[in-house]
């Protein structure tokens, strides 16, 4: 009985430490929307590597095997930060997402500026590393926007944005190329680079807010 009472007290203390903004659903709606929007944006930014890099490399007369290798390195880089995420966040703290976006921006720039493997390889790695840091941070942050019994629902909404961004990317890309009257294979990288730079300034300016202030223990 004493153990049960102690567990109940711990659970109540955990619930009281989570800010749900007075939401009646046990979820801080504004924070959840911010997380969803940010995750959708960064996923849209990085999937340019999957969708458009093969066409860009084909234009520069690389083989399909070369583009496949680059995409494999991109996914490998996404997984790498998970092995030392706490150290990364402990070092960068509220600037974690801003510097991760800077990594993505630099990666896109390297892919865009020259058709050389020795630039495209680090470009793919930098994009993957930046995304690999941000993704688990968003999942962790989501648990602080909902009560424990609502955390799974909140995570489902956030994770939905990943698939939604992938689903909509080809349609948005085609629409933007139609709007700007271009069929350039570099255009998606330039456009996503601009989005990344804008998002970087947003993250840096708002580094002390709920969405961007990351301090894992």
Question: PLM features: residue spans?
Answer:
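Extracytoplasmic gate region of multi-pass secondary transporters
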Residues: 31-72, 78
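C-terminal membrane-cytosol helix-exit motif in multi-pass small-molecule transporters
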Residues: 1-13, 199-207
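A late C-terminal transmembrane helix in Major Facilitator Superfamily
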Residues: 145-181
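Intracellular juxtamembrane helix-capping segments at the cytosolic ends
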Residues: 133-146
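Structural signature of the two symmetry-related core transmembrane helices
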Residues: 95-110
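Juxtamembrane intracellular "pre-TM" segments in multi-pass secondary transporters
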Residues: 4-38, 217
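Helix-to-loop junctions at the C-terminal end of transmembrane segments
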Residues: 80-94, 177-178
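A membrane-interface helix-boundary motif in multi-pass transporters
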Residues: 173-195
